[in-house]
Swiss-Prot record:
InterPro entries in UniProt: ER_ret_rcpt
Keywords: Cytoplasmic vesicle, Endoplasmic reticulum, ER-Golgi transport, Golgi apparatus, Membrane, Protein transport, Receptor, Transmembrane, Transmembrane helix, Transport
One Pfam family linked to the record: ER_lumen_recept
Start and end residues of each stretch annotated as Interaction with the K-D-E-L motif on target proteins: 47-48, 159-169
Membrane topology per record: Multi-pass membrane protein
Name of the protein this chain belongs to: ER lumen protein-retaining receptor 2
UniProt-annotated stretches for the region Important for recycling of cargo proteins with the sequence motif K-D-E-L from the Golgi to the endoplasmic reticulum: 204-207
Positions marked as site (Important for recycling of cargo proteins with the sequence motif K-D-E-L from the Golgi to the endoplasmic reticulum): 193
Transmembrane stretches, start-end: 5-24, 33-52, 59-79, 93-110, 117-135, 150-168, 179-199
Site (Interaction with the K-D-E-L motif on target proteins): 5, 54, 117
Biological role stated in the UniProt entry: Membrane receptor that binds the K-D-E-L sequence motif in the C-terminal part of endoplasmic reticulum resident proteins and maintains their localization in that compartment by participating to their vesicle-mediated recycling back from the Golgi. Binding is pH dependent, and is optimal at pH 5-5.4.
Lineage: Eukaryota, Metazoa, Chordata, Craniata, Vertebrata
Amino acid sequence: MNIFRLTGDLSHLAAIVILLLKIWKTRSCAGISGKSQLLFALVFTTRYLDLFTSFISLYNTSMKLIYIACSYATVYLIYMKFKATYDGNHDTFRVEFLVVPVGGLSFLVNHDFSPLEILWTFSIYLESVAILPQLFMISKTGEAETITTHYLFFLGLYRALYLVNWIWRFYFEGFFDLIAVVAGVVQTILYCDFFYLYITKVLKGKKLSLPA
């Protein structure tokens, strides 16, 4: 494992912890898209089914279990424990417009036409667009809490670091996964506008807002 993969994993973990702490400490999920969190839970569930079929390392298994557990914990907090604070009126992105095309694409473009491989491919494609409901929600409300922007920043940083990880692996290991790279590029592009606003506003103590 190279330093970019490790820091990417740590950034991803930081994003998840920030979100959970934000919801738990404020006793509110206001400003958080439950639909994005449902999509992320679906991503981790379909990606890590290999937990039942293979073992790579203790680190690998531990991280997979943490991602799955945290994603469902987040969904539970949003839709059950703090349901009264969930802003469903603004969380209106039509997720079927993401899930259905991604499902079709995973059947058409994959490494191997087997159930686990198709589900893994589905998870890669879906993760690249799973943040769209959250960004759409911010654009509808016109702003985001600072702690929410920190969550989004670390989530975007994780994906950007993974892109560097793939470049590193290509040059030093000869490894190249076109599906993962293309999906990662798409996901990073979706964060570009947010990164700009984060640097120019949030880091200067201003509130973040996206163009409506």
